[in-house]
Amino acid sequence: MDVFNLLEAAFLGLIEGLTEFIPVSSTGHLLLIGHFLGFESTGKTFEVLIQLGAILAILTVYSAKLLKILTDFPRDARTRRFVFGILVAFLPAAVIGALAHGFIKSVLFETPMLVCIMLIIGGFILLWVDQLNLRPRYHDVMDYPLPMCLAIGFIQCLAMIPGVSRSGSTIVGSLLLGADKRSAAEFSFFLAMPTMAGAFAYDLYKSRNILSLNDGALIGVGFVMAFISGVFVVRYLLDYVSRHGFKLFGWWRLIVGSVGLAALLVWG
């Protein structure tokens, strides 16, 4: 391990935190960066472990809301329905992710061209949804009905394809099912907590014999950068999308996907 490895870990942690909660696919960005810049020393297990920084970022920002949910849960039926809705939305990813884990890691994660194509397709979808004259029926995540939560959960499973984006799929699904932009992004935040925690725990178990103690410093640096940048994004994203929508992220995806695809076609 040298200074370059630490800078690499810091850069990857920064990218993870900045892109995890916005609809641009953090996994897709990390895979493309690893492919084009040759960041191989940390490996894909490292990329999973630094997600813990992003998980703790959202838990930190949402600590007051989570505490209120915890205290209201025993006596408030609306709060219980919301928590049950999050669990229902999480179940499809938990089941399908466990069953398809090997295929996802060994095939989908090794196909950078697929990442670029999904980034481009997702960019067009975001731009399309953003300009629709939708009439939202739900302005508070607490009011999402259980069938809607389950549908969002199945839509989230599309994000097992790198480049699709977990937050992008859940936000688009929520919007098309009647949510407004702010609550769609917030529901994506809440759903990220069990989904990311579950993926982290499962990948950590699967990779328990791969990481060595020598990787501790790299993971620590990546974790800190993912946490700091993740806190920044979570704090400001809801206000941003309420005012400006998702157009910026649609163009972001189109540019990154197109540049990546062109580079793959030219240099491989």
Swiss-Prot record:
The keyword Cell membrane applies. One of its GO terms (molecular function) is undecaprenyl-diphosphatase activity. The chain crosses the membrane at residues 3-23, 46-66, 84-104, 107-127, 144-164, 184-204, 218-238, 248-268. It catalyses: di-trans,octa-cis-undecaprenyl diphosphate + H2O = di-trans,octa-cis-undecaprenyl phosphate + phosphate + H(+). It comes from the Bacteria. GO terms for biological process: cell wall organization; peptidoglycan biosynthetic process; regulation of cell shape; response to antibiotic. Its EC number is 3.6.1.27. One of its GO terms (cellular component) is plasma membrane. Coiled coil: none annotated. The keyword Cell inner membrane applies. Keywords: Antibiotic resistance, Cell inner membrane, Cell membrane, Cell shape, Cell wall biogenesis/degradation, Hydrolase, Membrane, Peptidoglycan synthesis, Transmembrane, Transmembrane helix. InterPro entries: UppP. Catalyzes the dephosphorylation of undecaprenyl diphosphate (UPP). Confers resistance to bacitracin. Belongs to the UppP family. PANTHER family: UNDECAPRENYL-DIPHOSPHATASE. Bacitracin is thought to be involved in the inhibition of peptidoglycan synthesis by sequestering undecaprenyl diphosphate, thereby reducing the pool of lipid carrier available. This is Undecaprenyl-diphosphatase. It comes from Brucella anthropi (strain ATCC 49188 / DSM 6882 / CCUG 24695 / JCM 21032 / LMG 3331 / NBRC 15819 / NCTC 12168 / Alc 37). The gene is uppP.
